[in-house]
Regions:
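Substrate-binding/active-site clefts of carbohydrate-active enzymes
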Residues: 1-86, 90-108
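Conserved alpha/beta catalytic core and glycan-binding cleft of carbohydrate-active enzymes
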Residues: 85-87, 99-208
Length: 208
């Protein structure tokens, strides 16, 4: 649909008392000709090498160390909240920002960590009621801690472990479920470490 139709959809949801969350992807972008790859013939938004510049999906990774890229992403998110009146954003693939390419063995991406903190802090200053949600499957601490406490500044984090365990439990035959009760209770071991949001992720339920 058109931008105006999307605005109308969000407005209709609000009239019905339903909030709308924007799925926001600040990690990578498509390589299609109409996109940002080699925008002016040079790698402005992406890395200039394949090792860090190409994601596992074949898309281009944003280079978050560049101030202009940080501003571009911040202004894009602000635009969706301000002009379309979304109630918050769900940030995609946060683990790929916390760690280089999402690989913990490669270490923490300090530049991206700084970006996340500034990004969330900036949005909260302009939109205090906006809900900021992280899609993150790592054990990196402080994802939902305020930035002033050293955290990343998200309001909630998807509990992907709970989702996986629950789906696996119900995929197990009834005669075997008594041995797998721990899959229903394990999330309580870590549940108080962050402010978790329970969800069934679109990426997973599509597989049945």
């Amino acid at each position: 649909g058109t931008p105006d139709k999307l605005m109308k959809f969000v407005d209709m949801m609000h009239q019905a008392g339903i909030g709308v969350i924007m799925d926001f992807v600040p990690v990578h972008f498509a390589v299609d000709g109409y996109g940002l790859k080699l925008y002016d013939g040079t790698p402005l938004y992406e890395y200039d090498n394949k090792d860090t510049g190409e994601s596992e999906w074949g898309s281009c990774n944003f280079i978050h160390s560049r101030r202009e890229v940080q501003c571009f992403l911040q202004s894009a998110a602000n635009y969706w909240l301000e002009e379309y009146h979304f109630d918050g954003i769900r940030m995609d693939a946060v683990s790929r920002l916390i760690y280089w390419q999402g690989d913990e063995s490669r270490g923490v991406n300090d530049t991206a960590i700084d970006f996340l903190k500034a990004f969330n802090l900036g949005l909260k200053q302009r939109h205090p009621t906006a809900m900021l949600i992280a899609e993150d499957s790592t054990a990196y601490p402080g994802v939902t801690e305020p930035v002033w406490k050293g955290g990343l500044g998200f309001d909630y984090k998807w509990d992907l472990g709970w989702m996986h365990d629950t789906l696996e439990y119900f995929q197990t035959g009834p005669e075997y479920r008594s041995r797998d009760y721990h899959k229903l209770t394990f999330s309580m071991v870590y549940f108080w470490n962050e402010r978790y949001m329970l969800e069934y992720c679109h990426d997973e339920v599509v597989h049945g």
